[in-house]
Amino acid sequence: MGLFDKLAGWLGLKKKEVNVLCLGLDNSGKTTIINQLKPSNAQAQDIVPTIGFSIEKFKTSSLSFTVFDMSGQGRYRNLWEHYYKEGQAIIFVIDSGDKLRMVVAKEELDTLLNHPDIKHRRIPLLFFANKMDLRDALSAVKVSQLLCLENIKDKPWHICASDAVKGEGLLEGVDWLQDQIRAMKT
């Protein structure tokens, strides 16, 4: 670590690093959301389904995020739990237009919340009710009701309506997450 890094750390100017898990069913928009949060010169032009997981980084005014973009395909979801201990926050993405798989999303969320590495931690949960641009998309309120988010009493959580392709609703969510993480670190 160089002199400038040490000085910045002492003065509180160095960005705090935080590990975030990005979870949700396949085709919910996880990778597209993460891509939109990166600087425009670092964004991928083509988004392909994630196999296993990928690691992406982006920064806000006060935090440096390392995001574990976990595949939502059924055969890879069992990998999620291997990263729970490392996560300091969770982004859970839901396809608001996929009413048929809302039950599966709820089952995966319940499994996550009841896992020993998550259950007793006060870890912030950010939900993106994604694909709001679709004509028959469920509202964020309806998604919240179907996932029974009101039953989450021991963790801070927030849900945002989003359109990952256009980037709508993403900054609101990341701002909330940043505030939660900063509050935990003080």
From Swiss-Prot:
State what this protein does.
Answer: Probably involved in membrane protein trafficking at the base of the ciliary organelle. May function in cilia biogenesis. Isoform 2 is required for proper retinal function and organization.
A GO molecular function held by the record: GTP binding
Its membrane topology: Peripheral membrane protein
Among InterPro entries, the record links this protein to:
Arl6, P-loop_NTPase, Small_GTP-bd, Small_GTPase_ARF, Small_GTPase_ARF/SAR
**Where does the UniProt entry say this protein principally localizes?**
membrane
Q: Which gene encodes it?
A: arl6
GO annotations under biological process?
cilium assembly; determination of left/right symmetry; gastrulation; intracellular protein transport; Kupffer's vesicle development; melanosome transport; pectoral fin development; protein localization to cilium
| Source organism of the structure | Danio rerio (Zebrafish)
Protein name, please?
A: ADP-ribosylation factor-like protein 6
- Per the similarity annotation, which family is this? Belongs to the small GTPase superfamily. Arf family.
Write out the entry's keywords from A to Z. Answer: Cell membrane, Cell projection, Cilium, Cilium biogenesis/degradation, Cytoplasm, Cytoskeleton, GTP-binding, Lipoprotein, Magnesium, Membrane, Metal-binding, Myristate, Nucleotide-binding, Sensory transduction, Vision
Q: What happens when the gene is disrupted?
A: Results in the cardinal features of Bardet-Biedl syndrome in zebrafish, including defects to the ciliated Kupffer's vesicle and delayed retrograde melanosome transport. Isoform 2 defects does not result in Kupffer vesicle or melanosome transport defects, but rather leads to impaired visual function and mislocalization of the photopigment green cone opsin. Isoform 2, but not isoform 1, is sufficient to rescue both the vision defect as well as green opsin localization in the retina.
